[in-house]
Curated annotation (Swiss-Prot):
Protein name per Swiss-Prot or TrEMBL: sn-glycerol-3-phosphate-binding periplasmic protein UgpB
Organism: Agrobacterium fabrum (strain C58 / ATCC 33970) (Agrobacterium tumefaciens (strain C58))
Gene expressing this chain: ugpB
Record's subunit section: The complex is composed of two ATP-binding proteins (UgpC), two transmembrane proteins (UgpA and UgpE) and a solute-binding protein (UgpB).
Pfam families the UniProt entry points to: SBP_bac_8
Signal peptide from the UniProt entry: 1-26
Gene3D superfamilies per record: Periplasmic binding protein-like II (3.40.190.10)
Length: 436
């Protein structure tokens, strides 16, 4: 062999060795599709960076995919194209959709077990675990940003309107009267607004007031569900909102979280919104207060049901990716991470240890209202009306509701007509989706 040939072979061997070594030590990339915006998007990026910096084997890559419904639809499309991410954040309404796609997902309990971690559901808050588990108790998804709807109010606007800024309204009639006073006094352009008329004013309204949303325990007992949201209490509530909308005392912001901007801008004095919206409200520097979700005397308060979203794992991934997912979920479960996530975002800690650590630190003593979402959810044992809502097509049913609510708020129909149409259209859609 000539010296020249030997030189070529040594160079080739060296290059091959470098290629193999580089690939052997390359971090396994794990895509995490999510729907977080604003302050909560910053939290996502921070968590990914902290996990990536803590080890060298795996790299979490967060990818923003739009609103909650847009992210779910993107995930479904990616699965059909055989290119899904390893992890996808799915909002509460999409849980039934994911549970119905058994072959598409890998239960998080299995991911953790195969990754070498013992999953003990007793370490997690019971109400949250139950919402994301099969009837046999198998945990299907990882509860990332669980939330509860609460009332926010602008203390400065309350003072201008002659309202007691230290005592937010507790019942819905009190909210409506306060909203009227804010409007008529000129303290703000609008008295009251709400995000998520479906999740807050319908699903949680039913649970918090202990009235039925639908048959079969709101879908938790089976897929054959008949909606019950045209019952008298719903009609009374939505007619009150429709009446307030006529002169702008109630202002509609949109189907999801858009109304939060009406509150943060000072346009509206009262807002019902997810506890997870706290981060953005804090960033405005406004003088805000927090109260529990309002209720009707003689009905509530019972308990709220979790909102927010959980992290689902798609099937068909490599062992290395699943190991990385298990490591990431273990990282997220750490008490210090959960405590911090709760304190900076307003989302609820998913583990009992994180809740107890936050309580022990004195955080709630300094910020008593921040415990409100947890106390609402854990205050009473759930009834068949308040365990949750699980429909195979809940996003579709929410769309139907939003269409009818928007027609109602535009003055095209009253609350009774809107709710009757929701039941008629919703029942037909559920029957078709469930194959009954």
């Amino acid at each position: 062999m000539t010296l020249k040939k030997l030189s070529y072979r040594l160079a080739a061997a060296s290059a091959l060795s470098f290629f193999v070594t580089s690939n052997a030590f390359a971090a396994t990339e794990i895509q995490w599709w999510h729907a977080m915006t604003g302050a909560n998007n910053e939290v996502v990026d921070t968590l990914a960076k902290e996990f990536n910096d803590s080890q060298k084997d795996y790299k979490i890559t967060p990818v923003f995919k739009g609103t909650y419904p847009e992210t779910l639809n993107a995930g479904i499309a990616a699965f059909r194209a055989k290119q899904p991410p390893a992890i996808i954040q799915v909002f509460d309404a999409g849980s039934g959709v994911m549970m119905g796609a058994a072959g598409a997902i890998k239960p998080v309990a299995d991911v953790l077990k195969e990754g070498g971690y013992t999953f003990n559901k007793d370490e997690y808050l019971a109400g949250i675990v139950a919402y994301y588990s099969k009837p046999d108790g198998t945990m299907l998804s990882f509860p990332y940003n669980s939330s509860s709807p609460i009332l926010y109010y602008n203390k400065d606007i309350f003072q201008k309107a002659g309202l007691d800024a230290a005592n937010p309204p507790k019942t819905w009639p009190e909210v409506f009267e306060a909203a009227k006073k804010i409007k008529t006094s000129g303290a703000a352009q609008c008295g009251f607004t709400s995000t998520w008329l479906t999740w807050i004013q319908t699903e949680n309204f039913a649970a918090w007031n202990n009235v039925s949303y639908g048959s079969n325990e709101n879908g938790l007992g089976g897929t054959d569900v008949k909606l019950a949201v045209n019952a008298p209490l719903f009609v009374e509530h939505f007619q009150a909102i429709a009446d307030l909308a006529k002169d702008g005392t109630f202002r509609y912001g949109g189907r999801t979280s858009e109304a939060k901007q009406l509150f943060m801008s000072g346009e509206c004095g009262i807002l019902t919104e997810s506890s997870g919206g706290l981060g953005d409200i804090v960033k405005t520097g406004m003088n805000y207060g927090i109260g529990q979700l309002p209720y009707y005397e003689g009905h509530g308060p019972q308990n709220t049901i979790p909102g927010g979203a959980s992290l689902w794992v798609f099937g068909g991934k490599s062992d290395a990716e699943y190991k990385g997912v298990a490591e990431f979920f273990h990282f997220l479960s750490q008490t210090k991470i959960q405590s911090r996530l709760h304190q900076v975002s307003g989302y609820m800690p998913v583990t009992i240890a994180a809740y107890e650590e936050t309580k022990k630190s004195g955080f709630y003593d300094k910020n008593p209202a921040r415990e409100t979402p947890l106390l609402q959810m854990m205050g009473k044992p759930p009834t068949e009306n308040s365990k949750g809502v699980r429909l195979v097509n809940l996003p579709q049913v929410r769309d139907i509701m939003n269409e009818e609510f928007e027609a109602m708020l535009a003055g095209k129909q009253d609350a009774k007509a809107a709710l009757d149409k929701i039941v008629e259209r919703g029942d037909a859609a559920i029957k078709q989706a469930a194959g009954n």
